[in-house]
């Protein structure tokens, strides 16, 4: 399954807030003539659909394909400890996510574009693979070019950026970020139950 490239707010309406996909929030529209308050019977949601929704949150928030997410789940289940925690760590340590979280790009999709176009360096080496897994102590900065530096400087000055999590540090003057360590679960901005995602794939792994 390929990445979703349609209207972002449509996804937000369906599965909830996705901070890395878009900063915009969805407002429910009322049909003409619809009363201010209407009571509708809530349909009982199956366990499968609950797990599916949590899985979709990860897919859309981190901008990954179904195959990529499945591979991360497989890797996580091979680790000793909480599979759900390892899954989130893999996703958070992706280069595109790091680029977004440090403010070099306003969204995960914008981060992917920066990386694909060769604007980002990791430890002084240009990396053009969004799924590249970063390591603690790595240094992230723009390529030494006026174009790359200007694009990132403009993004950093935006008022719509998310708060930088404590496992990352940013020197705005030098346009240089450092990965201090692995992310703490509490610092993950997405509201998701990662254990339900592991359960969703339990029969496929």
Curated annotation (Swiss-Prot):
Keyword Ribosomal protein: yes
Matches recorded under CDD domains: S4
Protein localization: Plastid, Chloroplast
Residue span(s) of domain S4 RNA-binding: 93-161
Main location: plastid
Pfam family, one: Ribosomal_S4
Region (Disordered): 16-40
Signal peptide (UniProt feature, chain positions): none
Entry keyword set: Chloroplast, Plastid, Ribonucleoprotein, Ribosomal protein, RNA-binding, rRNA-binding
Molecular function as annotated in GO: rRNA binding; structural constituent of ribosome
Disulfide bonds: none
One Gene Ontology cellular component annotation held by this UniProt entry: small ribosomal subunit
NCBIfam families xrefs: PRK05327.1, rpsD_bact
Known role: One of the primary rRNA binding proteins, it binds directly to 16S rRNA where it nucleates assembly of the body of the 30S subunit. With S5 and S12 plays an important role in translational accuracy.
Family label: Belongs to the universal ribosomal protein uS4 family.
Subunit structure: Part of the 30S ribosomal subunit. Contacts protein S5. The interaction surface between S4 and S5 is involved in control of translational fidelity.
PANTHER family membership: 30S 40S RIBOSOMAL PROTEIN, SMALL RIBOSOMAL SUBUNIT PROTEIN US4M
Name under which the protein is recorded: Small ribosomal subunit protein uS4c
Organism encoding this protein: Euglena gracilis
């Amino acid at each position: 399954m390929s990445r979703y490239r349609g209207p972002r707010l449509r996804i937000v309406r369906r599965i909830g807030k996705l901070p890395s996909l878009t900063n915009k929030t969805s407002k429910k529209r009322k049909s003409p003539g619809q009363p201010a308050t209407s009571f509708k019977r809530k349909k009982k949601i199956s366990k499968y659909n609950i797990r599916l929704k949590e899985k979709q949150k990860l897919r859309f928030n981190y901008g990954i394909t179904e195959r990529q997410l499945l591979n991360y789940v497989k890797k996580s289940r091979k680790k000793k400890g909480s599979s759900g925690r390892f899954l989130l760590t893999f996703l958070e340590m992706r280069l595109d996510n790091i680029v977004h979280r440090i403010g070099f790009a306003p969204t995960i999709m914008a981060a992917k574009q920066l990386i694909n176009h060769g604007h980002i360096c990791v430890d002084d080496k240009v990396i053009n693979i969004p799924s590249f897994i970063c390591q603690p102590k790595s240094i992230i900065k723009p390529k030494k070019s006026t174009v790359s530096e200007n694009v990132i400087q403009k993004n950093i000055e935006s008022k719509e950026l998310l708060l930088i999590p404590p496992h990352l540090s940013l020197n705005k003057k030098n346009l240089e970020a450092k990965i201090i360590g692995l992310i703490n679960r509490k610092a993950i901005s997405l509201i998701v139950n990662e254990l339900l995602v592991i359960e969703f794939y339990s029969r496929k792994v």
